[in-house]
Amino acid sequence: MKRLGLIGLMLALVGAPAAMAQTNCTPKLGHPPLARKGMLIAAINPTVAPIQYIDDDGNIIGLDVDLGNAIAERMCLKMDFQSTQFATMIPALKEGRIDMINSFMFYTPERASQVLMVPYGASSMAIVVPKKNTDPISGPEYFSGKPFGVELGTVDLKDAQAASEALQKAGKPPIDIHTFDTYATVLQALSAGQVDGAFIGTEQAFYYRKKGQDFFRIALTGYDPHAEALAFKDPALADAVVAVMNEMHADGAFDKIFKPYGHCVLPGPYKVTTGPIPTPDCPPQTQ
């Protein structure tokens, strides 16, 4: 397996401007369990447009930002997003440097055994290939013996590894997996011809295509749907956020946040979850 270093737009460990808390209410939690008094610090990887990304003015925006700001406001806290490489988020949470992970993180039982996870939405993976490749593609197995790009530390990396192992057991060449720090660098590698195909989020694939990046074709969507989850270390903080999330779902605030993005919302009630969960029942995205 090969690994390329960080290139392009990834900004590691750079803070986004904090969203202001309401001035006429009392914070629901103090320090501890919060890492800093009056502030909710969340790790985010702002390279997953339109869910979380950096706009032309250098601000981190997107669905996850809208969600985090709404949660913090109801908790009477300032929201502080820390731009963090995805693979380092769980260690940072365990070390107490951040309060939560709010970064398009897929729920898995393995992750839920390490940190407290609260599923709330759902998404899936897409396979993208150079535009000139018109072959029908039904999964990563197509890339037997070929270079294939994925983001480091993600479910799509594990999916690619599992497919590669299955190919080897069948006596076929494994997938030549290349890992990258962000979806943006995955696409850069695809554009440069370093890989023959790649996994990126289905929403990201359609977003980049709408933005005029026409060097790739979306060969497959809806692969391996997973729930997305917030992640915490401290039970009191997790419970407080869960209470706010259920309140937001009941009063319609969740729908107002998610609807503009066309993003799938799980029905709730929301809770800290462990072990296997059902595959999310969300309509496939087509644009």
Roles of regions detected by a PLM:
Residues 65, 80-91, 135-136, 176-188, ...:
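Short helix-initiation/N-cap motifs at beta->coil->alpha
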Residues 22-25, 30, 155-172, 248-287:
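Ligand-binding clefts/hinges and TM-proximal coupling segments of bilobed small-molecule sensing domains
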Residues 23, 66-74, 133-134, 141-142, ...:
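Extended ligand-binding regions for polar small-molecule ligands
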Residues 41-49, 60-73, 105, 126-181, ...:
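Bilobed "Venus flytrap"/periplasmic-binding protein-like clamshell domains
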Residues 69, 73, 78-142, 278, ...:
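Acidic, polar ligand-binding/catalytic clefts
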Residues 87-91, 104-113, 159-163, 191-224:
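A ligand-binding cleft/hinge motif common to bilobed small-molecule-binding domains
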Residues 122-129, 209-246, 264-287:
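Periplasmic-binding protein-like
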Residues 23-104, 251, 260:
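Extracytoplasmic small-molecule ligand-binding "clamshell" domains
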